[in-house]
Amino acid sequence: MKFTTLATLALGAVSALAAPVTELESRQLFCRDVYVFFARGTGEVGTLGTVVGPGLSAAVKLAVRDSVEFEGIDYPALVSGYLAGGDRGGARTMANKVSQTASRCPNAKIFISGYSQGAQVTHLAARQLSAADQARVTGVVTFGDPYRDDALPGGLQSRRKTYCNVGDLICAGLPTLLAPHFTYGSDTPDAARWIAARV
C-alpha cells in the first residue's frame, strides 16, 4: 500500500514538472533551420537529377552550418512538360511544400530552386504562392532557366539568383540543347554560398 502511494505521488510529481506540449510546439519540434525545394531538369532520373541537384545538395549542406533539408520535387520531367512551359503538377507540389513548411516551421528559411524545366516549375510555383508565403521564401535559385527574362512575383525578384551560361539556348527560350546547358554543376558551390549568406 505504501509502495503504491509513493509510486503514485512520484508519477504525479513528474507529470506536474513536465510542461504540456502544445500542438504548435509539437509540429515545430522536427523543423530544420533551412529548407531547399529543388526541381530537376527534363529527362533526369530520381527527384534530384544528375546535373545540378546532387552537387547543390552537397554544397548547401557544407556551406550552411545549420540543419538543412534538401528535397527534390517528385514530378514527371517529361519533354511535353517543358514544351508546355513547365509541369503544372510539379509546380503545385513545390508550392504546397512551401506553404506547408511555412505554416509548420515559422522560423525556417525556405529556398526554391530548379534546373532547366525545373526552373520553369520554380517560376510557376512562385506564382501560385500567396503573398504571405512568397514573403516566407528567402531566395530563389535557377539554372539554365527558360524563364530567365521573366520577373518573379512580389518581392521574390529581388531575392533571385539565376545562372545562365553563354551559349545555352535554353536560357534564350529556344528548345535547343547544347553543351553549355549541361555544365551548371560547376556553379553549385557559388549558389550554395549565395544561399548560406542569406541564412
Swiss-Prot record:
Q: How is it modified after translation?
A: The 2 disulfide bonds play a critical role in holding the catalytic residues in juxta-position; reduction of the disulfide bridges results in the complete inactivation of the enzyme.
Modification type Pyrrolidone carboxylic acid: residues: Q28
Give site residues, Transition state stabilizer: Q117
Question: What pH-dependence text does the entry carry?
Answer: Optimum pH is 7-8.
The record's Pfam families line, in alphabetical order, gives: Cutinase
Gene Ontology molecular function, alphabetical: cutinase activity
- Active site location: S116, D168, H181
Please list the residues that make up the propeptide.
19-27
What Gene Ontology terms describe where this protein resides (cellular component)? extracellular region
Disulfide bridge positions per record: C31-C105, C164-C171
What is the residue range of the signal peptide feature?
1-18
Protein keywords: Disulfide bond, Hydrolase, Pyrrolidone carboxylic acid, Signal
Family the UniProt entry places it in: Belongs to the cutinase family.
Q: Any idea what job this protein has?
A: Catalyzes the hydrolysis of complex carboxylic polyesters found in the cell wall of plants. Degrades cutin, a macromolecule that forms the structure of the plant cuticle. Also degrades suberin, a specialized macromolecule found in the cell wall of various plant tissues.
Q: Which PANTHER family match?
A: CUTINASE, CUTINASE 2-RELATED
Task: Write down what this protein is called.
Answer: Cutinase CUT1
Q: Which organism is it from?
A: Coprinopsis cinerea (Inky cap fungus)
